[in-house]
Amino acid sequence: MVSPVPRVLATEVALELIRTLQSDYGPVMFHQSGGCCDGSSPMCYPAGDFLLGDSDVRMGVIGGAAFHMSQSQFAYWKHTQLIIDVVPGRGGMFSLENGRDVRFLTRSRLFTDAEIEILEPVLVGAA
């Protein structure tokens, strides 16, 4: 049996930062910002601090942290795999990496036709 293709992945440096944040804050979660105040950065919060709504989509889990975005944003990104990375800079004002001189960054690539057939399912709603 073929393994499902994940919709979201993290680089090793991103996984290391996630582990550090989990050590400092306990369980964490991500929500892909829609582009208002913090651009379109993945925002990291203590698990449960960001209130998910009925229209949020859980894309997957990276480093033990659930990764969400709005359903309307998912409509644009559903054909892409998100790759969460870390780059130098300032994190989003409310994101847990803020003040560490690094920030999470979302990179993406289009799925192949073959991959689209075996994607991991998403969960819709405050899951």
Where are these regions (language model features)?
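Domain-level signature for proteins that mediate thiol-based redox and metal-cofactor handling
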Residues: 1-127
